[in-house]
Amino acid sequence: MEKAEKGNPKGKAFRGNKLAFGEYGIQALDRAWITQQQIEAVRVALVRS
């Protein structure tokens, strides 16, 4: 069995781009995968400010 390919994150999201709660969100400036550690770092920075 071969390892599944991760693929390429393409274009802009048309679903799931509304804030569910809170006042702040992050927006990507380029196409790339984002890790859980990066998301957590942003969350901590927002909580501290």
From Swiss-Prot:
A UniProt-annotated Pfam family: Ribosomal_L16
Molecular function via GO: rRNA binding; structural constituent of ribosome; tRNA binding
Keywords: Ribonucleoprotein, Ribosomal protein, RNA-binding, rRNA-binding, tRNA-binding
GO biological process, one term: translation
Ribosomal protein in keyword set: yes
Coiled coil region boundaries: none
A cellular-component GO term for this protein: ribosome
Family, similarity comment: Belongs to the universal ribosomal protein uL16 family.
Entry function: Binds 23S rRNA and is also seen to make contacts with the A and possibly P site tRNAs.
SUBUNIT field: Part of the 50S ribosomal subunit.
Protein name in the entry: Large ribosomal subunit protein uL16
Gene: rplP
